[in-house]
């Protein structure tokens, strides 16, 4: 069964693995559309035949998902050292296995896709608000 990945403000979800001949479509990342864009599209899932039936990677802040691979996040040094935020989640695998791992805590990462045996995707990671000010 094909399923389109969900749309997201900061990155589109990956498409579900295909059945039997085509994969599910990836979700749109910049929804609603704004400029500069707030995210990138998720990748389509791979078909069952002749492929491995993998879920598509979710889009991140820096790039779209591609195949099962997640989109990159965006690096920022507001805390004094570079930290990458808002990476997309990886696509799920075919076969046995558990639910997908959750996204990175305090970095707004996407949750990873689950296996076909237990298709539950992981929750997205919590975000963080950082406020800077100049003390005089």
List each model region and its residues:
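Low-complexity, glycine/proline-biased repetitive segments and flexible coils/loops
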Residues: 1-136
């Amino acid at each position: 069964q094909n399923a389109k990945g969900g749309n997201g403000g900061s990155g589109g979800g990956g498409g579900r693995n295909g059945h039997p001949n085509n994969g599910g479509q990836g979700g749109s990342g910049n929804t609603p559309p704004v400029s500069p864009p707030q995210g990138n599209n998720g990748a389509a899932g791979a078909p069952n035949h002749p492929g491995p039936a993998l879920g598509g990677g979710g889009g991140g802040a820096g790039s779209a998902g591609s195949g099962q691979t997640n989109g990159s996040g965006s690096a920022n040094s507001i805390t004094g050292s570079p930290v990458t935020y808002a990476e997309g989640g990886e696509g799920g695998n075919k076969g046995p296995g558990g639910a997908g791992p959750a996204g990175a805590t305090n970095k707004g990462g996407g949750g990873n896709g689950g296996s076909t045996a237990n298709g539950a995707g992981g929750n997205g990671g919590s975000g963080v608000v950082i406020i800077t000010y100049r003390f005089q």
